[in-house]
């Protein structure tokens, strides 16, 4: 889903009040990326629609949470501590591209977000629309 579509912004300068900070963030996204991890701050996602951006955000946040859980469960001193530390496993480029084409499209992102939207609409009675 995030293959060749994710950047890391290492120097987040706080709330974007100045045009320069906004430009730096845009530069890190580049011409094609829709997802940005801002170190020591959080996530930023974009999309052609609100649904696409929201679905990317939800998926990226869940991926980050999973990564943190794995790393904390294998850290020294934890029950699942690994002797050789946690080793990265990279997905083959061909597999990653195939996965992105099936899960990272605007249509797929809409289909992933729509159930979340319907749940929020039901739980709030639509109050957020006012």
Predicted regions and their residues:
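Alpha-helix initiation and capping sites
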Residues: 15-19, 23, 47, 54
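Class I SAM-dependent methyltransferase SAM-binding "motif I" and its flanking Rossmann-like core
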Residues: 1-17, 21
């Amino acid at each position: 889903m995030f293959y060749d579509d994710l950047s890391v912004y290492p120097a987040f300068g706080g709330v974007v009040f100045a045009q320069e900070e906004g430009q730096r963030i845009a530069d890190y996204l580049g011409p094609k990326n829709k997802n940005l991890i801002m170190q020591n701050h959080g996530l930023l996602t974009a999309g052609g629609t609100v649904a696409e951006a929201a679905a990317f955000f939800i998926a990226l946040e869940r991926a980050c949470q999973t990564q943190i859980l794995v790393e904390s469960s294998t850290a020294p001193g934890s029950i699942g501590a690994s002797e050789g530390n946690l080793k990265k496993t990279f997905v083959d480029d061909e597999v990653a591209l195939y996965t992105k084409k099936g899960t990272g499209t605007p249509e797929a992102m809409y289909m992933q977000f729509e159930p979340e939207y319907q749940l929020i609409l039901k739980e709030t009675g639509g109050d957020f629309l006012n």
